[in-house]
Design a protein with these regions (language model features):
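Bacterial Sec-dependent N-terminal signal peptides
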Residues: 1-26
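Short, low-complexity N-terminal intrinsically disordered segments enriched in polar/charged residues
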Residues: 19-54, 58, 147-150, 154-170
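Hydrophobic pocket/interface hotspot
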Residues: 40, 52-53, 60, 76, ...
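A mature extracytoplasmic/lumenal domain signature
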Residues: 56, 66, 96, 103, ...
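A short gly/proline-enriched turn/hairpin at secondary-structure junctions
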Residues: 61-71, 82-89
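Surface-exposed, charged secondary-structure patches
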Residues: 75-120
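Glycine-rich beta-strand-turn "strand-cap" elements at beta-sheet edges
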Residues: 98-101, 142-144, 165-167
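Short beta-strand edge/turn micro-motifs at domain boundaries
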Residues: 122-150
Length: 170
């Protein structure tokens, strides 16, 4: 009986340690991703083109606030280059960030509320650990709209987006 109790106590201790160790690993990874995303935002604010785009994986996608803005890395670089060259980039600061992991810990996804020149926006995306570094695979920037003013926003954007909707349906 004593041996059985000791055996099960030992098993419980090992399982507890494994769970705590996995949680600690993800906390370390969350910190790394948070630092990476903050650096990503600072590089844009400083108009540091090379540093900013180095945060993206070679095969990555940027999805902007306009319905037509879906770019691979090269296309996004081409679009953004004039803004970086003229020092007319964006300055985003994270207000609240959530980070989640795949079971194997190689992929993470995040959502965050950002303080921007457009007021509160939402950044979300997928990051992958590539050669020991977290890289952005997909980034989505969305303008948040308070529910109380959605009808007014829809009224303003309807003439523009009705045309786009018709083009996309063809």
């Amino acid at each position: 009986m004593k041996k059985t109790t000791i055996f099960f106590t030992l098993i419980i201790c090992i399982l507890s340690f494994t769970t705590i160790s996995a949680q600690a690993k993800f906390e370390k990874e969350k910190t790394e991703i948070g630092i990476m995303l903050d650096g990503f935002n600072v590089a844009a604010a400083k108009a540091d083109f090379n540093t900013y785009f180095n945060y993206f994986a070679e095969e990555s996608t940027f999805i902007g606030t306009d319905a037509t803005e879906v770019w691979d890395k090269k296309a996004f670089m081409n679009w953004a280059k004039p803004y970086f060259d003229k020092n007319k980039t964006w300055n985003f600061t994270s207000l609240k960030r959530n980070i989640y992991f795949s079971k194997d810990g190689k992929i993470a996804w995040f959502d965050e509320l950002l303080d921007t020149q457009m007021k509160i926006c939402r950044g979300s995306g997928v990051v992958e650990k590539i050669n020991g570094q977290w890289k952005v695979k997909q980034y989505v920037l969305s303008v948040t709209v308070p529910n109380d003013v959605v009808d007014k926003v829809v009224e303003i954007k309807a003439p523009i987006e009705d045309i786009l909707i018709q083009k996309m349906k063809q």
